């Protein structure tokens, strides 16, 4: 047993220039781990609390000095002396210390930074790559990536309501090939947008953010870009999209209010619109199609589309086993998005992935729109054999860092590496 001997946190910046928490953990046998916490723009109201200072004289109130002080003070005092390899004890100690159901006292950003840095320190001490330390000898599945190539909603300053339009190289034979296919399609898409006189400025996650005439036009453009890049839509590269519908849902009128076409939709009308898109285009995955609190709407949506498309709950489940359990019992969605900072510890993240798998749900490990150079999620997705990752486009170093780490992992695994592609969607029946 080797214990944690020191913990140090500091305020650093994320990919949007906003402050976030970085923590370092040291062990008595020389182990060292460092981790940086990401942050989201479109956040579920049930997420664990990201503690911000609120001091308008610093970073517009977005500073995280209080969270940093919590790490260097209370958390360090409680965690120093614990076995660095006992991840569950480390995480539970911080959860108990916080004492709130949403980590609102110490901050999920403070707690998560130590949770992740501790795992890295343990892996370092044992001389293991993080994915192998977390997943053991069975960690061997490389994820099928969701590459966010057109941004809308809160991730871009344009008139597209749907937040993310993604390509998924489901026909690739390896992660390396998937990255190449994605990059080639990304560059083809850029040329196509330039031909149309559209902007090729990129959004928070590295995708293009053109002003398009409605929410269907991105699908048309993506199909053309996939074909121009030399691939078959659906067979080689499928389409996924994230509505982030809570962001344009009016709680008073209970309508979905879209900017792109200036319309208001009931849940049933919006479901029908999405169903038409799924039937018309090679769509394999839909995320957050309805408001996070519209459980009955989600149930109806799942009944109508659940056998032919992956339905991912992000704001609905917020990586929380309580909400996921409710969804499983109700027959809501068939997949969960996994975001470390939605729940706040590595242990709870593993529990959510395990619960999803046991229920026949897929799990998609995800970045946040405010990212950093930290590549923990690349190791996490392989460690858990989750099979899918959502980590942005083929631009911006904060996104590319994860793809590069995945390629390193695939190389290290050698002949044992497995890329499942279309078979990552083990609960679907749609034929392309």
From Swiss-Prot:
SUPFAM superfamilies: Enolase C-terminal domain-like, Enolase N-terminal domain-like
Cofactor remark: Binds a second Mg(2+) ion via substrate during catalysis.
EC number: 4.2.1.11
Pathway(s) this gene product operates in, as recorded in its UniProt entry: Carbohydrate degradation; glycolysis; pyruvate from D-glyceraldehyde 3-phosphate: step 4/5
Entry annotated with the keyword Metal-binding: yes
Keyword annotations: Cytoplasm, Glycolysis, Lyase, Magnesium, Metal-binding, Secreted
InterPro entries, sorted: Enolase, Enolase-like_C_sf, Enolase-like_N, Enolase_C, Enolase_CS, Enolase_N
GO MF annotation terms: magnesium ion binding; phosphopyruvate hydratase activity
One GO process term, biological-process aspect: glycolytic process
Superkingdom of this protein's organism: Bacteria
Protein family (similarity comment): Belongs to the enolase family.
Protein name: Enolase 2
Organism: Lactobacillus gasseri (strain ATCC 33323 / DSM 20243 / BCRC 14619 / CIP 102991 / JCM 1131 / KCTC 3163 / NCIMB 11718 / NCTC 13722 / AM63)
